[in-house]
Regions:
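Flexible, compositionally biased loop and terminal segments
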Residues: 1-172
Length: 172
């Protein structure tokens, strides 16, 4: 079965939307997490969050913390929500953290390799995706998991995300 599912729920670029849209998206996020956290737990799904959580409103962070706590011991599907995330942000953040370790003398430049970079990515500890499904008729990856998608199969569909069903997954 599927062990990991990553959803690109809110990109760093979404912060540039009009304020009323951002507020609406944050309310949708909080309501969805509040409504679904217990269902995730009952279905043995473990929730993870990647991205710049400091950018989220406090009420959203608090709701996410509760859901993470509720599902922390679950051993089934790993559901990874990318919130306030972009691939460029992730790579820049990883490079900055590696540079900081070099500056502190904890890491030698000569020892930096692909494994080092992967350790500093938000997805450290998760396998690279095997399949990326892009819905809504878009034909781009939109700054999502730029490093991790290197060898993934890419599937594009006109089906909108809210309408995406099990049959669509099998088709992919």
């Amino acid at each position: 079965g599927i062990g990991y599912l990553t959803l690109y729920a809110f990109s760093t670029e979404n912060w540039d939307r009009p304020e009323y849209e951002v507020v609406g998206l944050m309310e949708l996020l909080v309501n969805t997490i509040r409504d679904e956290a217990e269902t995730l737990h009952k279905n043995n799904i473990k929730l993870h969050v990647i991205g710049d959580m400091s950018m989220l409103p406090e009420y959203a962070r608090n709701e996410l913390k509760e859901a993470l706590e509720i599902t922390k011991d679950n051993t089934g599907l790993n559901l990874i929500m990318a919130l306030s995330y972009s691939g460029r942000w992730e790579l820049l953040n990883a490079v900055k953290n590696i540079a900081y370790e070099v500056k502190k003398g904890k890491l030698e430049i000569e020892n930096i390799d692909q494994d080092t970079l992967q350790q500093y990515l938000c997805t450290s500890g998760f396998p690279d995706p095997e399949l990326m499904i892009r819905t809504s008729g878009e034909y781009r990856i939109s700054n999502f998991l730029l490093y991790q998608l290197a060898y993934a199969e890419l599937y594009f569909t006109n089906v909108r995300w809210p309408d995406f069903r099990k049959e669509n997954l099998y088709e992919a």
